[in-house]
Every structure is written in structure tokens, then in C-alpha cells.
Amino acid sequence: MKNKFLYIILFSFSFSQFDLDARMLGMSGAYTSIASGYQSMGVNPANLVSNQSLSLNLFSANMFMVNDFLSVDLYNQLNGADFDNTSSTSYYSKNDILGQIKGSNIDIEAGVVAPFPIFNFAYKNFGITTHNKSYSKFHIPDTVLDVMLNGNTKDQRFLLDLGGEFISCNEIGLSYAQKVDYLGFPIYLGYTFKYIQGLAFFKMRDIQQDGSYILTQQTSFHASGKYLVEQAFGGTGTSSDFGLLLPEFYEGWNIGASLINLGGSVKFTSDNPTRQYLGSSFESTSGLRQNEYYYLDFKLDTMSVMTAFDSDVEFFSSNSIKVGIFSDIPLEEDYMPGDILYYTVNSNGDSLINVGESSIDIEDVIDLGNGSYLVPSSGLAGSQLQSTTSKDVNLDYPSSLRLGISKNFDEFGILSIDMVTGFDDSFGNSNKFRLSIATEIDRVSENFPIRIGASFGGRQPSSYSLGFGYKAGPLNFDFGRKYYSGIIRNKAKGAEFALNLSIDLTDFKNYSIKFGIPKINLPKLPKLPI
């Protein structure tokens, strides 16, 4: 039962570099120059030039979850292990456990890509795509596991850098592709314009200078932490995809390139239609208004054996308040009635922050260190939280560059190679190149292609993919799965699964689909005597 629960935790779930469909997943993302039909949108819109008829999505789902620490194999080794007796046959070193952590945190990521049925289609060189992308990530500092294994070491400062993020957006894209000839060479060009509907955004981060911590000394404990939880509902943005394909450019090799989500951004504001339509539901659920966030802090001050049992000594305190974030603070001479904060300059030329709102105590204002300040918001009006100095949530939408080559070998199948890199590290993106190599084998049967692929580099661990397709007339069924950090399930530290059902009417005239009840020959019954 425990193993089944672990499999669910590791493998039941899955931004810019997401695998968008089952075939792409089976090819480990090596898809830039081979994606076809509606599936080329979001990967390389130039491939729409080769679309001869109608291709339509009926159902599709892609989910993944990956971590950088625990696998089923490691769990089985730790389950029942002896961590102290080195002579035990089940001994497992604590240092070896901590050595499994890459960096200073245990990172856990999950995501979902959910295309809306029917509303993803391409007709010849024009296409429409609509889908939801959701991504979450949270990290646990390695010091938590260190304390669990070794206890709190004296005079060692254990950092408590807890944090995470979540974003969910709908994308609606319109694509168009065109073939041009240059010096006798065909060139495919494609473009996609995307409207982005931001549904929800959450982010928790450690804002204490030098980091939140716990410290054990000879006779006492000390701890301190400050965290900010940001949220937003209802955003709007746009982005663009540009694609290029050189079909059979050199000895049958196709060369493709694309820029995905170029110039993309999402801004969450109070006048957004999503916010206006569902704003009351969001506020009643979260208890927060637009541009209002949670500030959390705690402090453990010199707790010892004596103070722990002394009821008159308050050694622990915690707080949770609603705040607004204010930046672009004006100088005193530019101060306008209604401004929350303003700067004055003393005789030494230093800027000092002042409060323009009488209901706020200057001692409660928290400097974030980047020209922004946290201000308690319980006494502020909604209009003040949405003033020119109040900070709106404005996110850069993850964008990436894709480069790919492929070739269709007779009596074998397709070999495809891709290089992908992001322009930032936000929401699952990576600004490091990731190499993907894959093959789609149709030698056994053109109606049953088998896909095998692998990816290396970038921010995520190496991954290994396997998938297949089945064609029944115009109906296409595809399945793909990917394991991270291992080829087999027990060694993997994450997994991704995808299913896809679609229609392709390119060869519709040649299809022969018959529906009927199969003829059943019943055995003859013996004649009864008269």
C-alpha cells in the first residue's frame, strides 16, 4: 500500500518548454521540424504549410511531476534502513542521503497541459489553438532533512528558505503559414498570435535579510523568519510565435526553427474581465483584495530550558497580516494627497521614508530592499491598493528558441534532433540548452508507429521517452510517457504521461470505414421428434 501511494505521489502529475501532445512527448520534445497539422501550433507554426486538409483534436491531456531527490529505488533502500549501526546489513549512511540533494533545496515541480476538445484544429495553412497551461513548483531547504537526520548541530545556522509558485493561464492562438520560394528553394514561414488569459498566480518567498533561520547555541535556541505570499486573479497578455522550416534542404534533411511566446507578458489588474466576473468569488475564497498579499513572520528569542517552563516569559511570537506593496515612491515636494509613502532628504543627503496615511505607523512599514515597501493594508481603501505607486503583478511569459533537424529514412522511419533554450528561468523555463534526440519507427506498420527519445541538459534532469500511435482511418490515437533521471520506473525521479485522440482528413477519400454487425453462424439444433 505504501509503495502504491508513493507511485501516485511521484508519477500522477505533470511552460514554454512543455510537451504539448502525446507524439511530442514520445519524441522527447524533438518536434520542431516534424510536428504536423494543428499539433505544429505552439511548436513551429511554419509546419502548417504541409497541412493538406483538416486536422482536429478530439481529446488530449498531458501531466507531469518531477523532483530532484527521491526515486522509488531510493525509497525502498531507506525503508527500514539502519542509519546509525555501521555493521548492520541494512546500514545506510546519512551523508549519502544528503548527497542525493542537488544544490541547497529539494525541488518539486508539477504541471498540466489541457487542450480544449474540438477548439484545436488546422485547416490547410490556417489554425486555431486553445488550451490551459498550469505549473507549480515548491522547494524545501536541505537543512530540514539535515535536522531530521542529524539533529540541530550547535552553533550551526540552518536556513529555512521555504518557497513556491503556481500559475495557470489559458492560451488562444491564431496561426497562419505561407510557402515562399527563394533561388529555387522552398521556405515555409509561420506566425501565431496568442491571447493569454491569466487565471491565477501565487508565489511564496523568503524576504528576510540573510535568510530565515534556526540557530542552536550552548544554552538556547534562536529562530527568525519572514515570508511574503503574493497572489493575483484575472490577467491579460499577448505573445507571438514565429516559425521557419526548410523542407528537405540537404539530402532529405528538414531544418526548422521557431521563437515561442516572444514578447509575452501577463498583467493582473482589477479591470480585467476575468477579475470583474469572478472577483467576488476570488476575494471570498482568499480573503484578499486586488494587490493585497499576506506577510508572515515568526521569532524564537533565546528559548532555553528555563524559559520554556517559565510561563511569564514569551520567547516565541508569530504574525500574519495583509499588506500592499508600494514602489516608485515620490519625493516630499511631489507628494499628492492620497499617496501612502513619500521620501524626505536629510542634511546628509540620505533618503528617509515617511508615511502620508495617518492610519499607518512608520514602524510597521517593511523595506524590501529594492525600492519597494510592505505596508499594512487593513486600513487602506481598495483605490489606494490600486494607486499609481501600488505594485501590480506583471509577469513575463516564458519564451524559448527551438532549433531542429529531421529526416525520413525509407523503410525505417524518422530521426529527429532538437535544441531548445529559454530566455529566462521562470515557470519551468530554462535559459540553458537542452538536447533531444528521438526516432519514430514505422517499419513494422505505418499504422502503428513506435517512438523512442531522450533529452539531456537544461535545468531539468535527463529524461527518456517511449510512445506509440495507432491509426484507424482518419482517427489517430497516441500515447507517450517520459521518465526523469532514469530509464525504468524504479530509478526515475519523476514522470510525464500524455494521451491524444485526433482526426486527420488528409487522405479522407482513400479511407474505407464500414460499420455493421458481424455475422454470427449459430450451430444447427437437432430436430425434435414429432
Where are these regions (language model features)?
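General helical structural elements
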Residues: 6-8, 27, 198
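Sec-dependent N-terminal signal peptides
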Residues: 3-14
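N-terminal, post-signal peptide beta-strand-biased segments of exported outer-membrane/organellar beta-barrel
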Residues: 15-140, 145, 261-266, 504
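Outer-membrane beta-barrel porins/channels
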Residues: 17-25, 122, 126-530
